[in-house]
C-alpha cells in the first residue's frame, strides 16, 4: 500500500535524523490516545521499509475510572494487529502519596521506569514516544513558567539516547486529520480537560491566548527549540574542548577555569554539578555569577554538596569529615584521608621527605593561624597556588617539635638530605596531583 503524504513525511524524518536503523526493535509507548495510536499505525506501515520490529507497551496508572477500558482497548487492538504488547498496572496515586510528589510527575516517572525495564528485559533497542509539536510548545511554556534554563528549552528531542519522537515536528491537527482519514480508533482521556493539571491549563487557556498574537505559534516555538538545540550542541563542544581541564578527584570534580570567559565557566559549573547529580537553579547560578571575580568562596548547593572556588579552580564536592591526625611509626603504608604515604628505605616518588627519627612523627591537618619559621602557613599555601578549598586537607608532617614537610608547599632544609639511618616518607598517591602539578611552574620555591 502506498504511503500518504503524512506517512511519507514521518518516514523522511526518521531517515533524515537516523532515528531507526535496519534490524532495530522498537517499543511504542501506547496510551491508546490519538497521538500514540497514529504513531503505532504509521510505524506498522513503515516497518518493512525500515526493516524493523514493532512492539507496544501500556502502563495502567490506576488513576482514572476508565483506565481499565484503555488497557483493554490497546490490548485488543494490538492482538488484532498482530503486535506483541506488554501491559502492566501500577498504583501511581499511592506512589505519589508515599513520595509526596505530584500526580503528573509521579506518572511520568513510573511510565519511563516501566518502558525502560520492558525494553531492557526484551532486548528492545528503541522506545518510540508520540510527542508532537503542540506537546513541545506546552512543555516549553510549562518549563518557562516554572523557571528554566537551556535544558528546559531543549526538553524534548527527536532522539535522546534510546528514546525517539518521530512526530515531534508535526502539529496535532495533522495527527487528527490522519486519524480521521484512516478511521483509526482511539480512546479519549477525560483528564485532558481537567484544568487543575498545569499542562491542561496551558493547553486550553494559555496557548489559545498566545495564538491571538501569533497564529503560527507552533512553528515559532520550533524555531526557539532549534536555536536551543544549536546552543546545546555548542555547549557539548565546549565540554569536549575543556575535557582535559576537568578532573574527578575523590569526592570532588574540579576544573581549571584559567582564560575562560563567564559563559564557559558557568556552563562547566553546570556540567560538573550535573555529574554530581545536582541540577543548579537560577538563584544558584546567579549567585555563582556574582562571585566569579572573587578569588575564593564556597556556596552550599544542597545538604551534602558544595561548590567552591580557589584561584582559577572550581570544585563541586561532597561534604565529608576528615581525619585530623595520624601517627607514623614502623615502615609501611599510611592512609591520611585521600592521601597515601609510605615510610621506607627508598625514594619512590617526586614528593618525599627524609625521616631521621621515627619517634613522634605524625601527619595532621593544619591549625588556624599556624606559622613555619615565622611565616603563616596560609601565606605559604597562597604563594604555592594551593586553592583555598584544598588548604584544610593538605597533610602537615611534623616531628615532636616542628613542621618538617607540607607536600607541594614546604620542606625543612634539615630533612632534605639523607643521613645514615634515615628512612623516606614518600607521597605515593593523592587525588589532587593533577591540580597541584598544574601550577608547579608558577610556584615560588619555599625553603
Curated annotation (Swiss-Prot):
UniProt keyword annotation of Ligase present: yes
Protein name, entry field: tRNA(Ile)-lysidine synthase
A Pfam short name: TilS_C
Family per record: Belongs to the tRNA(Ile)-lysidine synthase family.
Catalytic activity reported: cytidine(34) in tRNA(Ile2) + L-lysine + ATP = lysidine(34) in tRNA(Ile2) + AMP + diphosphate + H(+)
Free-text comment about domains: The N-terminal region contains the highly conserved SGGXDS motif, predicted to be a P-loop motif involved in ATP binding.
Single GO cellular component term: cytoplasm
Residues binding ATP: 31-36
Amino acid at each position: 500500500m502506498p504511503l500518504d503524504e503524512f506517512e511519507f513525511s514521518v518516514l523522511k524524518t526518521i531517515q533524515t535524523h537516523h532515528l531507526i536503523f535496519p534490524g532495530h526493535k522498537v517499543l511504542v509507548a501506547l496510551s491508546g490516545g490519538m497521538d500514540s495510536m497514529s504513531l503505532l499505525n504509521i510505524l506498522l506501515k513503515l516497518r518493512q521499509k525500515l526493516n524493523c520490529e514493532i512492539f507496544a507497551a501500556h502502563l495502567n496508572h490506576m488513576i482514572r475510572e476508565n483506565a481499565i477500558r484503555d488497557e483493554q482497548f490497546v490490548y485488543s487492538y494490538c492482538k488484532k494487529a498482530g503486535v506483541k504488547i506488554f501491559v502492566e498496572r501500577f498504583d501511581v496515586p499511592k506512589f505519589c502519596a508515599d513520595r509526596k510528589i505530584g500526580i503528573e510527575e509521579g506518572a511520568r516517572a513510573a511510565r519511563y521506569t516501566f518502558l525502560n525495564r520492558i525494553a531492557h528485559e526484551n532486548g528492545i533497542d528503541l522506545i518510540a514516544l508520540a510527542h508532537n509539536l503542540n506537546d513541545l510548545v506546552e512543555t516549553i511554556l510549562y518549563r518557562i513558567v516554572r523557571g528554566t534554563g537551556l535544558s528546559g528549552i531543549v526538553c524534548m528531542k527527536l532522539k535522546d539516547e534510546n528514546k525517539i519522537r518521530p512526530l515531534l515536528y508535526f502539529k496535532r491537527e495533522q495527527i487528527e486529520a490522519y486519524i480521521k482519514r484512516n478511521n483509526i480508533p482511539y480512546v479519549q482521556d477525560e483528564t485532558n480537560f481537567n484544568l487543575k493539571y498545569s499542562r491542561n491549563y496551558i493547553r486550553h487557556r494559555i496557548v489559545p491566548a498566545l495564538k491571538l498574537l501569533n497564529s503560527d505559534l507552533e512553528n515559532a516555538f520550533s524555531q526557539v527549540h532549534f536555536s536551543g538545540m544549536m546552543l546545546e550542541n555548542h555547549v557539548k563542544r565546549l565540554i569536549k574542548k575543556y575535557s582535559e581541564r576537568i578532573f574527578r578527584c575523590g569526592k570532588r570534580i574540579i576544573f581549571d577555569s584559567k582564560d575562560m570567559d563567564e559563559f564557559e565557566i558557568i556552563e562547566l559549573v553546570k556540567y560538573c554539578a550535573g555529574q554530581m547529580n545536582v541540577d543548579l537553579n537560577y538563584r544558584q547560578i546567579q549567585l555563582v555569577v556574582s562571585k566569579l571575580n572573587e578569588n575564593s568562596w564556597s556556596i552550599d548547593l544542597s545538604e551534602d554538596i558544595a561548590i567552591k572556588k580557589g584561584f582559577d579552580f572550581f570544585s563541586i564536592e561532597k561534604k565529608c569529615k576528615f581525619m585530623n591526625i595520624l601517627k607514623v611509626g614502623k615502615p609501611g603504608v599510611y592512609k591520611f584521608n585521600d592521601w597515601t604515604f609510605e615510610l621506607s628505605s627508598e625514594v619512590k616518588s617526586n614528593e618525599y621527605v627524609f625521616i631521621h627519627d621515627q619517634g613522634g612523627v605524625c601527619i595532621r591537618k593544619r591549625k588556624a593561624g599556624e606559622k613555619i619559621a615565622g611565616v603563616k602557613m596560609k601565606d605559604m599555601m597562597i604563594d604555592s597556588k594551593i586553592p583555598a578549598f584544598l588548604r584544610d586537607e593538605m597533610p602537615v608532617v611534623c616531628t615532636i617539635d616542628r613542621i618538617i614537610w607540607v607536600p607541594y608547599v614546604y620542606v625543612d632544609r634539615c630533612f632534605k638530605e639523607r643521613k645514615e639511618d634515615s628512612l623516606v616518607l614518600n607521597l605515593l598517591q593523592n587525588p589532587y596531583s593533577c591540580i597541584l602539578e598544574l601550577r608547579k611552574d608558577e610556584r615560588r620555591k619555599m625553603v
